[in-house]
């Protein structure tokens, strides 16, 4: 059977959304049928993603593939336009994988399960759409689509301060989204041609002053999601009140939307401004790494400690994408994928621990590892992954960013030494706060009342399965990173070459390849 013209991405996006609409029709009193229905939909969509990847994606092609383009509003060239390249395909795979596991992690949810899984499936399709759409206005719509499910999940199934956390989340993200809308309209209507097509917009000459204005606005919008200091304060509050599956989606997917958008739009569509903003991104990345690591060390709430750890790790993404080297840009992509897996595993463990101890305060834990051997092993392994132990994905990703930036000829040797030193301080702080966290949770001082509690049972098969599914790719990438880097290498190398042509100090040495716009654009279907 020939699948060359099959609408893979439209199917992947719309299938979970359409399936969610049938959830209210399912007769279910105890929530079991709804759980299995949602899990089945998640698995089927993930299988479709994997099938599309193996049948229609070419590693060596840096341009968009699996392209579909259907005219929506002809007057302004508004289209349902989707496609995947090296920037988006790995994150689409990551979304399908983590969301399916998050549905399985949501098994204990008993309050309004139909609504909960309905929102989960909406997020599934919406998140993939963010990574796949190639129309600026459509991107804005899908970006906004994420706000409603996340807000409702936080405000209905969150903790005591859930309304505060949910409101803060939506105010930050909606405020940032205004910059996306303004930038989309400005870029679309600038010049002689009115178009929202990203490829066509990338060919427009905005002039450096307008590029800088657009870049600054988009940096604020995407910096909220990444998040970048000082736009990060919503994240610890959101994580502090969210449930385990919501944690997995926040850390595993939602933060990656910010990193992806910075690469796709700021770097890909505004390369001259990205070159000038490079030092700013590097400094912000170092601030993220060091500040968040120090703040995480001071946290006594387990969820907030891991949340600040996530902020710290995302600093490497900023440094990598501003290194203007193939290795650094590749490391930024790998760090997003790696942290998606590691962050999801850590927050799943937070949820599993809270279900047993009913506390998030480290002072009230202690000694639980003696009674729960599987939980002990799972916590230890996930923490080793987070502190970038050699042989795990985090080590490879951070090493690539370090070496990529240290060897970058876009910055002076003095600046590179200072940045590498400061980032190394953050790396040293990571095992300090993670190992101290493990000591307080698993060892002592022992909370005798907690350890003696009859509900303090070890991990069940479902929990072991979820963690095993996350640890296998974490270790696999650590041992053989090429399995993942080859998916996006041609695209990131092409992007880096174009960016290097925009760096003032490299303009005479960098030769950027020309993009074949005909390949990036799909034939019009009316």
UniProtKB/Swiss-Prot annotation:
Stated role: NDH-1 shuttles electrons from NAD(P)H, via FMN and iron-sulfur (Fe-S) centers, to quinones in the respiratory chain. The immediate electron acceptor for the enzyme in this species is believed to be plastoquinone. Couples the redox reaction to proton translocation (for every two electrons transferred, four hydrogen ions are translocated across the cytoplasmic membrane), and thus conserves the redox energy in a proton gradient.
Record field: catalytic activity: a plastoquinone + NADH + (n+1) H(+)(in) = a plastoquinol + NAD(+) + n H(+)(out); a plastoquinone + NADPH + (n+1) H(+)(in) = a plastoquinol + NADP(+) + n H(+)(out)
Main location group: membrane
NCBIfam families: NDH_I_M, PRK02546.1, PRK12561.1
Family: Belongs to the complex I subunit 4 family.
Location of the protein in the cell: Cellular thylakoid membrane
Cellular component, GO annotation: plasma membrane-derived thylakoid membrane
Gene that encodes it: ndhD2
Name the UniProt record assigns to this protein: NAD(P)H-quinone oxidoreductase chain 4 2
A GO molecular-function descriptor: NADH dehydrogenase (ubiquinone) activity
């Amino acid at each position: 059977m020939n699948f060359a013209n099959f609408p893979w991405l439209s199917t992947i996006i719309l299938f979970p959304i359409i399936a969610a609409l049938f959830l209210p029709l399912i007769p279910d009193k105890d929530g079991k049928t709804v759980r299995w229905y949602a899990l089945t939909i998640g698995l089927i969509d993930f299988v479709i993603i994997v099938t599309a990847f193996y049948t229609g994606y070419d590693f060596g092609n840096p341009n968009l593939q699996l392209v579909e383009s259907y005219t929506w509003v002809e007057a302004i060239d508004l289209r349902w336009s989707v496609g995947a390249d090296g920037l988006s395909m790995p994150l689409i795979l990551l979304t399908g994988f983590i969301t399916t596991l998050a549905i399985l992690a949501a098994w204990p949810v008993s309050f309004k399960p139909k609504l909960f899984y309905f929102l989960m499936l909406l997020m599934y399709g919406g998140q993939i759409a963010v990574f796949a759409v190639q129309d600026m206005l459509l991107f804005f719509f899908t970006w906004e689509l994420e706000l409603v499910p996340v807000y409702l999940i936080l405000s209905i199934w969150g903790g005591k301060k859930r309304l505060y956390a949910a409101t803060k989340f939506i105010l930050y993200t909606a405020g940032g989204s205004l910059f996306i809308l303004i930038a989309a309209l400005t870029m679309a209507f600038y010049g002689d041609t009115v178009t929202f097509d990203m490829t066509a917009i990338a060919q427009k000459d905005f002039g450096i002053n307008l590029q800088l204005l657009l870049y600054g606005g988009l940096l604020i919008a995407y910096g909220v999601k990444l998040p970048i200091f000082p736009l990060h304060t919503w994240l610890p509050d959101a994580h502090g009140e969210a449930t385990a599956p919501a944690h997995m989606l926040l850390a595993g997917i939602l933060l990656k939307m910010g990193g992806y958008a910075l690469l796709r739009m700021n770097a890909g569509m505004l390369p001259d401004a990205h070159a000038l903003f490079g030092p700013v991104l590097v400094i912000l990345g170092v601030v993220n790494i060091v500040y968040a690591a120090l703040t995480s060390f001071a946290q006594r709430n387990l969820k907030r400690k891991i949340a600040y750890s996530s902020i710290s790790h995302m600093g490497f993404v900023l440094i990598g994408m501003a290194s203007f080297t193939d290795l650094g840009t590749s490391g930024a992509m790998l760090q997003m994928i790696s942290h998606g897996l590691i962050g999801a595993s850590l927050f799943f463990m937070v949820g599993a621990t809270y279900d047993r101890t009913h506390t998030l305060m480290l002072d009230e834990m202690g000694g639980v590892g003696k009674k729960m051997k599987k939980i002990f092993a799972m916590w230890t392994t996930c923490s080793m992954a987070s502190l970038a132990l050699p042989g795990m994905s985090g080590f490879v990703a951070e090493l690539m960013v370090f070496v990529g930036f240290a060897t970058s000829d876009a910055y002076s040797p003095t600046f590179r030494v200072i940045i590498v030193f400061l980032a190394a301080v953050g790396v040293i702080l990571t095992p300090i706060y993670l190992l101290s966290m493990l000591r307080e949770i698993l060892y002592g001082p022992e909370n005798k009342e907690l350890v003696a509690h009859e509900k303090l049972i070890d991990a069940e098969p479902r929990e072991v399965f979820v963690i095993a599914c996350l640890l296998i790719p974490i270790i696999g990438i650590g041992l053989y990173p090429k399995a993942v880097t080859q998916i996006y290498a041609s695209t990131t190398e092409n992007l880096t070459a174009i960016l290097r042509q925009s760096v003032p100090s490299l303009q005479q040495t960098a030769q950027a390849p020309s993009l074949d716009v005909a390949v990036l654009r799909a034939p019009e279907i009316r």
